[in-house]
Amino acid sequence: GVTFDTGGLNLKPGNSMRYMKKDMGGAAIAIALFLIIKNYLKKSKIKLIIPIAENSVSSNAMRPGDVLKSFNNKTIEITNTDAEGRLLLADALTRAELFNPKLIIDFATLTGAARAALGEDLPAYYTNSNEVAKKVESTVYSKSIWRMPLHDAYMQKMQSDVADIVNASSDGMAGSITAALFLKEFLPYKKVNWIHIDTYAWSSSFLN
């Protein structure tokens, strides 16, 4: 969860920063869901990983052009310091390997692009498993969430000359998809079932 997001050195304008204390919305959803499941399923083997940071401006803040090493040793070129949430999620996804999961679910208020594409009522979700997608579509909530494609061809937008991957594409296109593709690169093993839910659609509500 990003407890407050200024955008870092790629600073957000004031009107975009006003309610960025809500950028921990994905973490809040994950914690609430975890507590509900643990309460009703006493023998549940569910595990919760919450990476936490504040994205601020300081003398040691990450800078555009920096190269960071992730938990799985992949290197990441920082092209935009306001694409920080995916850096936290990347390490959390890799760390999930410690629990040998059959399914990984992540929640994040990750991209404005998801809300631009689907509006304020439909969170986008991505999955590498059609079986998982079928289960989502079979629920009563299937009309309230929308599957988006993991279009692998867009990985070319994430290429770096100095690192394994960039943290954000520079052309501004397909921002939600490229963010999901970035996360996919940090799954602990390729065959693990995974679903990424971009909850930024809901973030416009001041009640959140």
Please give the residue ranges for each predicted region:
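A generic structural signal for tightly packed, nonpolar segments enriched in small/aliphatic residues
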Residues: 1-208
